[in-house]
A protein has these predicted regions:
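Mid-length scaffold segments of soluble, non-membrane domains
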Residues: 81-158
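N-terminal secretory signal peptides that target proteins for export/translocation
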Residues: 1-19
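Flexible glycine-rich active-site/ligand-binding loops centered on an Asp-His dyad
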Residues: 170-196
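Sec-dependent signal peptide recognition
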Residues: 18-28
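Cysteine/selenocysteine-centered motifs that mediate thiol-based redox chemistry or coordinate metal-sulfur cofactors
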Residues: 195-206
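Hydrophobic h-region of N-terminal signal peptides that target proteins for export
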Residues: 27-36
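N-terminal secretory signal peptides
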Residues: 36-91, 126
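Short strand-turn-strand beta-turns centered on an Asx-Gly dipeptide
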Residues: 165-167
């Protein structure tokens, strides 16, 4: 009798341990799935980030290729408060946004600066002096970019665009006009490439 009770107790314990192990395994799998987020060209981005106490959701990942050689240059990730496929609603959003640019190859600083100047000239053809002064400030904060380095831009309505280079905060470029022009570069009528824009709006990253 005592032996049977002991055996039953042991089996019960084993059942509890097995069940607990299964639950722990499931929780670990779910945690890893959440942590993995989305991937493009071997670069992983989380599904959510926190900016100034606000939870932002990944709207899309876009891939930028070199114009002529068609080699991969960078993957960009756009985080927003409310996801959307409408570029105008994102450009004119009154909520915070974060754009992360993860480079897939080395790029010289002069190439980066020339691209910014061209991009802002497209979205603001009248080129007001105040805007171009702020573009000059942005360019002054940049340097040669190496593979796997990141530029992060945090848009805060009423404040402007905070610029972070490889985790180092460079400063904030003020003005809602600048922040709208900045988002128009990526989502407007003349983006660096149609494929990049499509990806940031929720399409395929390829």
């Amino acid at each position: 009798m005592h032996r049977e009770v002991c055996e039953n107790f042991t089996l019960h314990q084993e059942g509890v341990v097995t069940t607990a192990s299964a639950i722990n395994g499931l929780l670990l799998a779910l945690t890893m799935a959440v942590a993995q987020g989305k991937e493009c060209k071997g670069v992983n981005f989380p599904d959510q980030v926190e900016v100034g106490g606000s939870d932002l959701t990944l709207n899309g990942l876009g891939l930028q290729k070199a114009t002529f050689l068609r080699v991969d240059v960078y993957v960009a990730a756009l985080y927003v408060t409310v996801t959307s496929h409408d570029p105008n609603s994102l450009i004119n959003s009154d909520g915070p946004q974060e754009l992360i640019v993860h480079f897939l190859r080395n790029v010289g600083v002069e190439d980066v600066r020339k691209q910014w100047s061209r991009d802002f000239a497209h979205v603001a053809p009248d080129r007001p002096v105040s805007l171009m002064q702020r573009v000059a400030t942005l360019n002054a904060w940049l340097s040669d970019v190496k593979r796997d380095e990141r530029l992060t831009f945090i848009r805060q309505p009423g404040e402007g665009v905070q610029v972070i280079v490889n985790g180092v905060v460079k400063g904030t470029i003020p003005g809602d006009d600048f922040s709208r022009d900045f988002m128009s570069i990526w989502l407007g009528a003349a983006p660096p490439s149609p494929e990049l824009r499509r990806g940031l709006l929720g399409g395929k990253c390829d």
